[in-house]
């Protein structure tokens, strides 16, 4: 077998050669970022020219992927949609079983943005390919010329819903360990792991990956994140997350940085209860936000909001449903892309009245896995009709999602999945482990 550095060069150079031009995820490796308490990204150019400024070129990229023109076209499109179409485009549904016809029918009939695939929806490789193909056809049958959100939790380690079908990668803590051992090599193997993960997922028909985890764990007292976190050190975590975002962008798949503003300090599990995080805003900025700031600098397309009770920010309200938390992300950190909730079927938000509607009104663009997808769709339709949520808010959310899916299709078309993607993924996984341990 070739030495680690030699095999790494083959993986990175080969995959990028096949993928075509460098695009938004490329550039020199980031140095270790400083811990910032202010916004770390520059807003993208406005699509509305002033009296003294020339019009913005529609090919100008936004700070999160799509071009200004793609976003404007998405806004024009959703402005023509019915409330039923709008409501669907802000929901990523859940389904039961492994029959591809079930989620395909949901996407077509409810106009869903897409679905989240879990291990319970997976039988084997052939079934996965049949399912993702059926979902793509369903969106096209619904009149959409952009792909649906077909997402999966494939973080590496034990949160990998395609176990036995896609290549197994180590926990994301390996990325932090690799960077701690050798910063430049660590960032490269992390980026290569994300690149090959994304390419392999695309080969299976997926358009989204619910990764990377940007939570900074506090160690043994953290029952939920643990080894899913890249590090207990905010600076190491920031480097790992930034490298992963570049890799996923290179692969032409939508990544999802999670769980804002950071679940690693919570001492209870949001799958079961609503955890309280008693950190002050200053503590959150210093400990939890650096990886998210790094992701935004690297043009992260989507950020997932956590179900946490931030007692010093929005007490008693899950972060995913708190306008103050969306303001922290958008106004303070400068994020302009798609915001998505954590699963709305989790115990942290169970029992709350109309949780999806609360999240949408607070600032969510995508509502992930509500308990009952059809009922949630109708709730949003009725809320638009009654004015409980403004049509403007739903159009804003839907347009971002449409623009991002348009970007994904464009980048994926430029970067075909190589025939030897599985071999490359296995090599990248081995290299990450070797660099870490």
Residue ranges and their predicted role:
Residues 82, 126-140, 144, 232-390:
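Second-shell residues forming the walls of enzyme active-site clefts
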Residues 54-58, 85-90, 110-117, 177, ...:
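Acidic/histidine-rich, surface-exposed loop or edge segments in extracytoplasmic proteins
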Residues 2-9, 14-109, 351-437:
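Preference for extracellular/luminal or secreted protein segments
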Residues 136-170, 190-214, 237-261:
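Glycine-rich, aromatic-flanked loop segments that form ligand/cofactor-binding clefts
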């Amino acid at each position: 077998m070739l030495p680690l550095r030699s095999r790494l060069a083959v993986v990175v150079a080969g995959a990028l050669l096949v993928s075509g031009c460098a695009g938004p995820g490329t550039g020199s490796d980031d140095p270790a970022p400083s811990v910032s308490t202010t916004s770390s990204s520059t807003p993208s150019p406005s699509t509305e020219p002033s009296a003294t400024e020339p019009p913005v070129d529609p090919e100008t990229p936004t700070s999160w992927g799509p071009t200004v023109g793609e976003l404007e076209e998405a806004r024009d499109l959703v402005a023509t949609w019915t409330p039923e179409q709008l409501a669907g485009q802000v929901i990523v549904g859940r389904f039961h079983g492994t029959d591809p016809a079930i989620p395909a029918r949901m996407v077509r009939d409810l106009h869903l943005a897409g679905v989240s695939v879990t291990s319970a929806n997976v039988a084997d490789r052939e079934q996965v390919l049949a399912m993702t193909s059926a979902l793509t056809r369903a969106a096209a049958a619904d009149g959409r010329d952009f792909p649906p959100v077909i997402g999966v939790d494939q973080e590496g380690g034990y949160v990998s819903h395609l176990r036995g079908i896609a290549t197994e990668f180590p926990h994301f803590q390996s990325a932090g360990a690799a960077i701690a051992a050798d910063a430049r090599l660590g960032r490269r193997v992390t980026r290569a792991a994300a690149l090959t993960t994304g390419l392999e997922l695309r080969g299976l028909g997926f358009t989204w990956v619910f990764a990377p985890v940007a939570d900074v764990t506090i160690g043994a007292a953290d029952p939920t994140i643990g080894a899913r976190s890249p590090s207990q050190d905010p600076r190491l975590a920031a480097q790992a997350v930034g490298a992963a975002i570049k890799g996923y962008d290179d692969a032409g798949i939508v990544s999802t940085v999670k769980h804002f503003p950071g679940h690693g300090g919570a001492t209870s599990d949001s799958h079961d209860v609503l955890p309280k995080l008693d950190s002050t805003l200053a503590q959150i900025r210093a400990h939890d936000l650096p990886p998210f700031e790094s992701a935004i600098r690297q043009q992260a397309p989507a950020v997932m909001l956590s179900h946490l009770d931030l007692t010093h920010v929005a007490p008693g309200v899950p972060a995913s449903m708190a306008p103050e938390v969306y303001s922290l992300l958008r106004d303070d950190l400068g994020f302009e892309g798609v915001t998505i909730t954590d699963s709305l079927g989790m115990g942290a938000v169970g029992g709350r009245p109309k949780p999806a509607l609360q999240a949408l009104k607070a600032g969510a663009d995508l509502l992930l896995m509500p308990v009952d997808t059809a009922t949630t769709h109708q709730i949003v339709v009725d809320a638009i009709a009654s004015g409980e949520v403004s049509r403007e808010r739903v159009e804003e959310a839907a347009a971002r999602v449409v623009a991002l899916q348009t970007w994904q299709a464009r980048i994926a078309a430029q970067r075909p999945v190589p025939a030897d993607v599985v071999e490359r993924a296995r090599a990248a996984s081995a290299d990450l482990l070797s660099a870490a341990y």
